[in-house]
């Protein structure tokens, strides 16, 4: 009861305008990220609805990943120089228009040649990389951080995450569940004869992106940024360049970036491939795969983000909290991989399906714990107060780089282990992919542990107990 009262009091510290802004930012987040990244984690065997193969979905993801690598750091610069609200508005509108293009291709895919269709998908995913990174990612989190005080940063991100989960549950998960249960009860194979329901699904997402863009523009407050003119632009450019150099020289920030990379595989590759493994190797029912994917992606985020953010605030160190989440996640994924050795042929093993489903959900809970406070770890290293955006840019650049190079690797592995005449990889292929990702998670955990141990030693030497070095300035 005491914890609930404490949480209630913390929530009362947010104004109505701030809460509305965080809810809107949750919607902005979910709709921009949905089509390029999350739908494949909600709808098993997305490739069948698109009319391509499983390894080609990995190729599309790698394309957007490489574009992200090229635009992440410039995105931090833009967020420092231009209005984050206007950048986010532009991101929502442009992503919506591109999503309409995707919906049109889904609707007409049977009348197009497979190569021409895949080339268009490649262009779509590449453009999404620009609209969901260069003008979206850093502006989103800068605006979110401005809606909370220093003490309530994690809770503010938790509220945004909870809103994200609610929006995603209603507009992404429930619609996907209805489509798979009613229009495609036999799975994606049947979509070839009736692509309209899934195309309508994409049109709905595109429409919501347009609506959300205007709500961001009119209802999300933004702190003023430094004004630039012809006399100060050169000086400011030099200052920004110096800030980037300072950021790049911070070895702790590099290690935390690798730590974020290790955490991100839980949100991205594990979320996708473990679901695919349940569906295609353990032969889980289609409806179960959709329910698990939706629950993990959206329901859990709404249910646990605020509480995990509040729990993280109680820890003396955000990095320690993230280390615990990552360590437990590694154990659960290792257990999932070992389950694969219990699958025999094409027979449904309900024990494997049940245990794998539980492990999948548990890793989802831990993953959202990582997502909620992964940027708060910046507060535990010494950086300049004006380097926040560029620091987030470096964290995201390294952390999300796996969407490029790792999906290139998984595409090769998946294709090599795809049996002749099939569109999905084998159980051995899924196990190899999961093992590769597990190694990345272990490396990230090691990097985070090093920073935590060094910070602990430095605090003891200085006679301090507070791991938060930085006084947050979001202006």
UniProtKB/Swiss-Prot annotation:
GO MF: transmembrane transporter activity
Domain of life: Bacteria
Regions annotated as coiled coil: none
Membrane-spanning intervals of the chain: none
InterPro entries according to UniProt: MFS, MFS_trans_sf, Sugar_transport-like
CDD domains linked to this entry: MFS (cd06174)
Family designation: To E.coli YihN.
Stored PANTHER family: INTEGRAL MEMBRANE TRANSPORT PROTEIN, INTEGRAL MEMBRANE TRANSPORT PROTEIN-RELATED
Protein name: Uncharacterized protein MG294 homolog
Originating species: Mycoplasma pneumoniae (strain ATCC 29342 / M129 / Subtype 1)
Organism taxonomic ancestry: Bacteria, Bacillati, Mycoplasmatota, Mycoplasmoidales, Mycoplasmoidaceae
């Amino acid at each position: 009861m005491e914890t609930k009262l404490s949480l209630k009091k913390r929530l009362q510290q947010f104004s109505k305008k701030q809460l509305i802004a965080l809810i809107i930012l949750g919607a902005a987040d979910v709709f921009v990220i949905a089509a390029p990244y999350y739908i494949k984690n909600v709808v098993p065997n997305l490739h069948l609805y698109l009319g391509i193969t499983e390894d080609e979905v990995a190729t599309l993801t790698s394309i957007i990943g490489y574009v992200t690598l090229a635009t992440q750091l410039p995105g931090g610069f833009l967020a420092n120089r231009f209005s984050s609200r206007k950048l986010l508005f532009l991101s929502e509108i442009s992503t919506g228009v591109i999503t309409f293009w995707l919906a049109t291709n889904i609707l007409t895919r049977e009348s197009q040649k497979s190569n021409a269709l895949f080339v268009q998908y490649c262009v779509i995913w590449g453009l999404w990389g620009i609209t969901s990174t260069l003008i979206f990612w850093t502006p989103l989190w800068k605006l979110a951080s401005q809606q909370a005080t220093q003490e309530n940063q994690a809770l503010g991100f938790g509220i945004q995450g909870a809103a994200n989960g609610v929006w995603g549950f209603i507009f992404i998960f429930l619609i996907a569940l209805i489509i798979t249960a009613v229009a495609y009860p036999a799975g994606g194979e049947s979509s070839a004869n009736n692509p309209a329901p899934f195309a309508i699904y994409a049109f709905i997402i595109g429409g919501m992106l347009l609506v959300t863009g205007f709500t961001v523009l009119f209802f999300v407050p933004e702190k003023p940024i430094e004004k630039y003119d012809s006399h100060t632009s050169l000086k400011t450019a030099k200052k920004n360049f110096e800030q980037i150099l300072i950021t790049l020289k911070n070895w702790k920030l590099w290690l935390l970036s690798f730590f974020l990379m290790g955490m991100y595989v839980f949100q991205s590759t594990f979320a996708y491939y473990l679901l695919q493994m349940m569906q295609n190797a353990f032969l889980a029912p289609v409806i179960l795969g959709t329910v698990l994917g939706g629950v993990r992606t959206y329901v859990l985020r709404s249910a646990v983000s605020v509480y995990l953010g509040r729990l993280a605030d109680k820890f003396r160190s955000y990095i320690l909290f993230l280390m615990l989440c990552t360590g437990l996640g590694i154990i659960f994924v290792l257990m999932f991989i070992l389950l694969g050795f219990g699958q025999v042929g094409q027979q449904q093993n309900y024990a494997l399906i049940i245990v794998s489903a539980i492990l999948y959900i548990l890793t989802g809970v831990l993953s959202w714990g990582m997502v909620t406070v992964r940027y708060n770890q910046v507060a535990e290293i010494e950086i300049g107060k004006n380097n926040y955006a560029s620091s987030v840019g470096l964290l995201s650049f390294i952390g999300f780089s796996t969407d490029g190079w790792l999906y290139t690797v998984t595409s090769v592995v998946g294709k090599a282990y795809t049996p002749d005449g099939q569109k999905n990889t084998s159980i051995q292929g899924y196990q190899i992919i999961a093992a590769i990702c597990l190694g990345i998670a272990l490396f990230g955990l090691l990097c985070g542990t090093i920073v935590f141990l060094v910070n602990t030693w430095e605090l003891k030497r200085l006679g301090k107990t507070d791991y938060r070095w930085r006084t947050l300035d979001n202006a």
